[in-house]
Amino acid sequence: EPQAAANAMIAGNQDIDAAMTYEPYLGAVRAKPEAGKIIATTLDYPMVMDTFGCTPKFLKENPKAAKALADGYFAALDMIKADPKKSFEIMGADVKQSGEAFEKSQAYLRWQDRSANQKFFAGEHAQFSKEAADLLLEIGIIKQIPDLKALADTSFIQ
């Protein structure tokens, strides 16, 4: 859980060497720098953000739903631009924050639109996947490197 991870870091839990969390919980770590170091955010690596994925079976059986899911994400980004106050209220409610508090948290996010997603999957994704696969193989998490070109179906972000 991202909130629990942040809380453990700022509490100084000796059993925690590293944790993955996100805004608004990352803000708690940012506010207490002696508790931990933030290594990377979407400001450093724009595509490190929430992701969604579907199984190949789902994509094959439900291409319209998959396209609608991607288009819905991009519509949400349009709403953030067009009506940020309302957008921050909605998103803040999901993480138990006021709209004003969420607005401050989201200042540390870089929202990736359709064009940025297309750019990422046109090159950066392949490089990242190769580096990740090499590392996972080296440390024994995977036994062989999968077909990296089959990891993402980008037709839904076109």
Language-model features: where?
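Short helix-initiation/N-cap motifs at beta->coil->alpha
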Residues: 1-11, 24
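Secondary-structure end/capping motifs
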Residues: 61-141
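Ligand-binding "clamshell"
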Residues: 28-42, 102
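Solvent-exposed coil/turn segments that connect beta secondary-structure elements
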Residues: 23-25, 44, 57
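A bilobed periplasmic-binding-protein/Venus flytrap-type ligand-binding module shared by bacterial periplasmic
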Residues: 49-64
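Alpha-to-beta junction loops
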Residues: 11-21, 33-36
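C-terminal solvent-exposed extensions
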Residues: 132-158
